[in-house]
Structures are given as structure tokens and as C-alpha cells.
């Protein structure tokens, strides 16, 4: 297991830093979760969803700014990836959105997409009970 406040958070921050360096877009990362242990499957799923969200924002949305937020709400982790790109009226189910849904579903979570103002990915993942640091 990994702690979101250190190991996993560092991985996500490095991912964001790498994207800032190569994409020309500005990616902002805000992790408001501390003291949670993530198993490898959770950490990997979140990493891949962030990666796919950034890729979609750049490739399809032509975004210049992307905001990634991870926070805790009740018994869930909320992951939001939002951009200032062109958005879309009709969300097509391509490989990227399909894989995001599959990864979050494997963690018993749900993901929704909104293309009305830029593009937003909202994922809600249940926290596995008892997995917090004191």
C-alpha cells in the first residue's frame, strides 16, 4: 500500500510536471487528501485516468490549461480533471473514455464526463475501509 500524501502524490506530481514540460499546456495539480493508503491497483488506476484525461484534453480539446484535483468527500475519493479546451456537445465513447470507465469501475467507482464548458472528468472512488494512517 502507498500513502497518497507522499509516494502516490509524488508520482502524480511528477506526471504533471512531465506533461507541463512536453505539452505546452499548463497542468495544475491539487491533492487535498492526506493519510490514505492506496493499494497498487488503486494507485495505478488513478495514474492512468489522470494520464488519459490529460491526453484527451490536449488531443481532442486543444486545452491550454488543465486542472487536476483529488479530494476526499465522506467515504469516497473524488478525482476531477477539468480543462479549458473546446469541449464537446456530444461525448463519444472512444477508447480513452471507455478505459477510464473500466478502470474506475474495477475500483467499484463511477465516472462521468461533461463537455459543456471545456471538458470535465469526475470520478468517485470508494475508500477501502480502515486504510488510513493515524
Residue ranges and their predicted role:
Residues 76-80, 122:
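Short, highly conserved beta-strand within the GHKL-type HATPase_c fold
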Residues 10-44, 50, 54, 58, ...:
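Helix-loop-beta hinge of the Bergerat
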Residues 83:
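Acidic ATP/Mg2+-coordinating residue in the GHKL
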Residues 24, 58-67, 91, 115-116:
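Short connector loops in the HATPase_c
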Residues 65-75:
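Short beta-strand/loop element within the Bergerat-fold HATPase_c
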Residues 1-8, 12:
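Single conserved hydrophobic/aromatic residue that forms the stacking wall/gate
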Residues 89-117, 122:
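ATP phosphate-binding glycine-rich loop and adjacent ATP-lid/helix-beta elements
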Residues 123-129:
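C-terminal beta-strand of the catalytic ATP-binding
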Amino acid at each position: 500500500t502507498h500513502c497518497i500524501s507522499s509516494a502516490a502524490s509524488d508520482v502524480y506530481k511528477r506526471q504533471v510536471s512531465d506533461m507541463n514540460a512536453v505539452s505546452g499546456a499548463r497542468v495544475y495539480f491539487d491533492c487535498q487528501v492526506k493519510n490514505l493508503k492506496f493499494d497498487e491497483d488503486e494507485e495505478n488506476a488513478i495514474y492512468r485516468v489522470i494520464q488519459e484525461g490529460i491526453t484527451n484534453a490536449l488531443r481532442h480539446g486543444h486545452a491550454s490549461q488543465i486542472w487536476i484535483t483529488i479530494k476526499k468527500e465522506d467515504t469516497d475519493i473524488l478525482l476531477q480533471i477539468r480543462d479549458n479546451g473546446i469541449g464537446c456537445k456530444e461525448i463519444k465513447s472512444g477508447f480513452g473514455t471507455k478505459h477510464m470507465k473500466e478502470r474506475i469501475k474495477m475500483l467499484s467507482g463511477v465516472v462521468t464526463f461533461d463537455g459543456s464548458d471545456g471538458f470535465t472528468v469526475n470520478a468517485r472512488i470508494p475508500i477501502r475501509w480502515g486504510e488510513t494512517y493515524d
